[in-house]
Amino acid sequence: MSNAYKRVLLKLSGEALMGDDAFGINRATIERMVADIAEVVRLGTQLAVVIGGGNIFRGVAGGAAGMDRATADYMGMLATMMNALALQDAMRHAGIEARVQSALRMDQVVEPYIRPRAIRQLEEGRVVIFAAGTGNPFFTTDTAAALRGSEVGAEVVLKATKVDGVYSADPKKDPSATRYTTITFDEAISRNLQVMDATAFALCRDQKLPIRVFSINKPGALKRIVLGEDEGTLVHV
């Protein structure tokens, strides 16, 4: 079975790294994620990752609590750096070669984000982990995923969440909520479906970059998507 995609951008939330913990990084959870990523890398698909920081600090929450929003967002970017290093370390233990590139310069620790270098590393079979979001406050890591996916020529953004797709309502609160198999960007924006923020949706729509929303907790889901199987929800133009 041939791969449906040559190059993908995987968006991981910081919360996904917590597992069942209330805070931080659950080692067993990150190792399971890396095992799923390893399967995709072995298939020959080029994989880039944008990682959030909500398991450590959320800029939006900091702003809401009275902190200067820009300062809170920069703190959130530093949280993504910690997650990126943890993910790179777990990949190294699994035999996967990975590079971290940061939108904020931290030269003693990771490379700065340089687009041609990122593309070259993907072509050479390395996983590239993009840290620090877009490097600008007021932009989410979902928007960073849309931006980096567009920049490196990904064919799809794979949004890993705790639910197996986009629903008409929150399935945890509304038992009658139904899952969409496919939905357009305009429908998702007009219905205010809180899967990605409107800026990320609009950027992907304008770049004709589809998003597939799937559950990170479903074993083998990432591999099935790369092989072209119908998993989760496809958001398209």
Curated annotation (Swiss-Prot):
Which top-level group of life is the source organism from?
A: Bacteria
Q: Name one GO biological process term.
A: 'de novo' CTP biosynthetic process
The reactions it catalyses are: UMP + ATP = UDP + ADP
InterPro entries (UniProt xref):
AceGlu_kinase-like_sf, Asp/Glu/Uridylate_kinase, Uridylate_kinase, Uridylate_kinase_bac
- Activity regulation field: Inhibited by UTP.
- Which EC number applies? 2.7.4.22
Named in its record, the pathway it takes part in is: Pyrimidine metabolism; CTP biosynthesis via de novo pathway; UDP from UMP (UMPK route): step 1/1
Subcellular localization(s) per the UniProt record: Cytoplasm
Species the sequence originates in: Burkholderia lata (strain ATCC 17760 / DSM 23089 / LMG 22485 / NCIMB 9086 / R18194 / 383)
UniProt function note: Catalyzes the reversible phosphorylation of UMP to UDP.
Q: What class of enzyme is it?
A: transferase
Q: HAMAP family, from UniProt?
A: PyrH_B
GO-annotated molecular function: ATP binding; UMP kinase activity
The primary site where this protein sits is cytoplasm
Q: What is this protein called?
A: Uridylate kinase
